[in-house]
From Swiss-Prot:
Source organism of this protein record: Latilactobacillus sakei subsp. sakei (strain 23K) (Lactobacillus sakei subsp. sakei)
Family that this chain belongs to: Belongs to the WhiA family.
Cited Gene3D superfamilies: Homing endonucleases
GO biological process, one term: regulation of sporulation
Gene Ontology MF terms: DNA binding; endonuclease activity
DNA-binding region: 277-311
Keywords annotated in UniProt: Cell cycle, Cell division, DNA-binding
Superkingdom per UniProt: Bacteria
UniProt entry tagged with the keyword Cell cycle: yes
Name of the molecule in the record: Probable cell division protein WhiA
Function description: Involved in cell division and chromosome segregation.
One Pfam family from the record: LAGLIDADG_WhiA
Length: 314
């Protein structure tokens, strides 16, 4: 069964985007998952992922935007529980592509770790770059079973700072921390995670997330209410047990007939109905119904009277 994060990424890889915005997405994918090597005295670009749908998207975006032919390779893992690695390899026009995406400088050697201002200055390009960044290094917890958490991993501190800046452009309150010789941008608020999914175009995943969140929050509210009512019920039971204990003490020590008429009346009624509420006791008073506060006052008097006699005996 596919994880929730896999469902999000699958939806993102199926989005159709304008070529200009696709460049921003491709820039993130290559900057975060790409590596350069020398082959026959020229640079070769390898973009690696464990997700075949992401590999196909990188291949398609390169072809659509630069009319270049790249290779799609599969590196099979022999160890158990290890996913295959999918590699998009570009052997020709590598510098042209990387320079256009502002990933390397014109000298072909200097790597730009920051996001170019022409992306950061335009909302739709920012959305596309964040989509690529999530596809390349993002994960999100299953909202049904885990605490709310979404993160994007980046190797470079400057790049991480730009991701935080771009996310907070949409009021997402993104935070950052250091992890595994890299940097993490993360969200922990359910509402902000849903907003981010909307920002990067994962509308269906966002709607599913919101549905789960509503049910989960409702379930938590019901549990809190039940716990509160259980606590109140336990208090009521304990109070009734204490009242009966004190009334029985008064009956056995001084006799209920020796109590004032109003106290005797409520004492006899409580002994007859040990489990009913104060409101119900008030409705059953032989001399006429009285309020819950009136019943509570009389029972408190009986408790004080019993405790007073007990102290005298001690």
């Amino acid at each position: 069964m596919a994880s929730y994060a896999s469902e999000v990424k699958k939806e993102l890889t199926q989005l159709e985007v304008h070529p200009e915005h696709a460049r921003a997405e491709l820039a993130a994918l290559i900057r975060m998952n790409g590596s350069l090597s020398l082959m026959n005295h020229q640079f070769v670009l390898n973009v690696q992922t464990e997700n075949p749908a992401i590999a196909r998207r990188i291949y398609s975006l390169l072809k659509q935007n630069y009319q270049v032919e790249s290779e799609l390779l599969v590196r099979r893992k022999m160890k158990l529980k290890k996913n295959n690695q999918y590699i998009v390899r570009l052997k020709y026009d590598t510098n042209t592509v990387l320079n256009d995406l502002n990933i390397v400088a014109e000298d072909g050697f200097t790597i730009h770790t920051r996001v170019s201002e022409d992306i950061i200055d335009e909302d739709q390009r920012v959305r596309s770059y964040l989509r690529g960044a999530f596809l390349a290094g993002g994960s999100v917890n299953n909202p049904e079973t885990s605490r709310y958490h979404l993160e994007i991993y980046s190797l470079y501190e400057e790049h991480n700072q730009d991701i935080v800046r771009m996310m907070n452009r949409f009021g997402l309150n993104a935070k950052t921390t250091v992890r595994r010789s890299g940097y993490i941008t993360y969200l922990k608020e359910a509402e902000k995670i849903a907003d981010f999914l909307q920002v990067i175009g994962a509308t269906n995943a966002m709607l599913k997330f919101e549905d789960i969140r509503i049910v989960r929050d409702m379930r938590n509210s019901v549990n809190r209410l039940v716990n509160c009512e259980t606590a109140n019920l336990n208090k009521t039971i304990d109070a009734a047990a204490k009242q009966i204990e004190n009334i029985e003490y008064l009956r056995d020590s001084v006799g209920l007939d020796n109590l004032p008429a109003k106290l005797r009346e409520i004492a006899l009624l409580r002994l007859e109905f040990p489990d009913i509420t104060l409101k119900e006791l008030g409705e059953k008073m032989p001399s006429g119904a009285i309020s819950k506060s009136g019943i509570n006052h009389r029972l408190r008097k009986l408790n004080q009277l019993a405790e007073g006699y007990q102290q005298k005996v001690i």
